[in-house]
From Swiss-Prot:
UniProt EC number: 2.7.1.140, 2.7.1.151, 2.7.1.153
PTM annotation (N-acetylalanine): residues: A2
Protein name according to UniProt: Inositol polyphosphate multikinase
MF GO annotations: 1-phosphatidylinositol-4,5-bisphosphate 3-kinase activity; ATP binding; flavonoid binding; inositol tetrakisphosphate kinase activity; inositol-1,3,4,5-tetrakisphosphate 6-kinase activity; inositol-1,3,4,6-tetrakisphosphate 5-kinase activity; inositol-1,4,5,6-tetrakisphosphate 3-kinase activity; inositol-1,4,5-trisphosphate 3-kinase activity
Tissue/organ expression: Highly expressed in kidney, and at lower levels in hippocampus, brain cortex, cerebellum, heart and lung.
Gene responsible for this protein: Ipmk
Length: 396
């Protein structure tokens, strides 16, 4: 079991100081504000809360599901655990801090878990159920029929989007989708449906796609090398930073642009495209041709850098000025000196400029985990197909 978490301010991720107060419930807890799927507090018999210290409280489900999930976390996070497979599995789960019960209701037991979103300013969150079967081997015929009818394509697709919450830059707000959105996705619309999670209203966040692929591939590697456990109706929780000003200490693209562009030259409404979390700008009157040209210029800058510079120094201005690509750009589409100012941004982009976004992918929901002596083929199938879809989005 992990050590107690540091105390955190109890404010919904992405909220501001002016947000209305959240009603406090048992022991000062509040409903989890950024939950995208699963049992909702106040709507279902059991639900998910947030503790004043920032951890997530998941109420145990009725037997046998609740005790089974508790047993899973207890086994994986046992202090004396020496099983290499389970120790490796910890890397892909939320940290577990034991159980918690409110003083006024000691018989209500909650799992105390890490809030995977806590380090993000504007967390974009997606819950994806993995596997070809969303029912376990001991399910009744009625339960099997119920689960199959919810999403008949589960066997073929291998995963189901249960919900998502995406931050949109232009409106400073979140777009949410529930389980009905995922159930409506077909083989033909699956790619577009998943890509919606990575679109911030201005552009497709390919940096977040790439980061997510890396995380899922590590989980796949774990599954391909273990024959101890089989998972049913379990999910992956995807999280990435939706803000242009992440909470981490890493420099961000808006900061870079602000360093080199004169005050007032660009506004938030001017964002046109972004490439690997880099924002490109133009006036609405200029049309999309400017953004495409600037995108090409930025790509050319990166290629020139990789080809001619092995050190960490940035390109000199005169190097790129000699490139005819800049001369071929349509000047009548540009306002004033924006192009030359954007050139300066490109020149000063440091090497390895945040190619991969800040992102997390964690396994959640373990009420249907069973001992096994074979590879979990259903889960592996789902992971591989999900990776294929993500790669298709990245390559589009």
């Amino acid at each position: 079991m992990a050590a107690e978490p540091p105390a955190l301010r109890l404010r919904p991720p992405g909220s501001t100081g002016d947000s209305p107060p959240v009603p406090r419930l048992l022991g000062g807890c509040v409903p989890l504000s950024h939950q995208v799927a699963g049992h909702m507090y106040g709507k279902d018999k059991v639900g998910i809360l947030q503790h004043p210290d920032g951890t997530v409280l998941k109420q145990l489900q009725p037997p046998p599901r609740g005790p089974r999930e508790l047993e899973f976390y207890t086994m994986v996070y046992a202090a004396d655990c020496a099983d290499a497979v389970l120790l490796e599995l910890r890397k892909h789960l939320p940290k577990y801090y034991g159980v918690w019960s409110p003083p006024s209701a000691p018989n209500d037991v909650y799992l105390k878990l890490e809030d995977v979103t806590h380090k993000f300013n504007k967390p974009c969150i997606m819950d994806v159920k993995i596997g070809r079967k969303s029912y376990d081997p001991f399910a009744s015929a009625e339960k099997i029929q119920q689960q199959v009818s919810k999403y008949p394509l589960m066997e073929e697709i291998g995963f189901l989007v249960l919900g998502m919450r995406v931050y949109h830059l232009h409106s400073d707000s979140y777009e949410t989708q529930n389980q009905h959105y995922g159930r409506g996705l077909t083989k033909e619309t699956l790619k577009e449906g998943v890509s919606k999670f990575f679109h911030n209203g201005f552009c497709l966040r390919k940096d977040a796609v790439a980061a997510s692929i890396q995380k899922v591939e590590k989980i796949l590697q774990w599954f391909e090398n273990q024959k101890q456990l089989n998972f049913y109706a379990s999910s992956l929780l995807f999280v990435y930073e939706g803000s242009s000003q992440p909470a981490t200490t890493k420099s961000n693209d808006r900061t870079l642009a602000g360093r080199f562009l004169s005050k007032g030259a660009l506004s938030d409404a001017d964002v046109l495209e972004c490439n690997n979390n880099f924002h490109l700008f133009s006036s609405p009157a200029n049309g999309t041709s400017v953004g495409k040209s600037l995108s090409k210029a930025y790509s050319r800058h990166r290629k020139l850098y990789a080809k001619k510079h092995q050190s960490q120094t940035s390109l000199k201005v005169e190097t790129l000025e000699q490139d005819n690509g800049w001369k071929s750009m349509s000047q009548e589409h540009l306002n004033g000196n924006v192009l030359s100012q954007l050139e300066k941004v490109f020149y000063h982009l440091p090497a390895g400029r945040q190619e991969i976004a800040e992102a997390e992918v964690r396994m959640i929901d373990f009420a249907h985990v069973f001992p096994s002596n074979t590879v979990d083929e259903g889960y592996v199938y789902g992971l591989k197909h999900l990776i294929a879809v993500l790669r298709s989005i990245l390559d589009s």
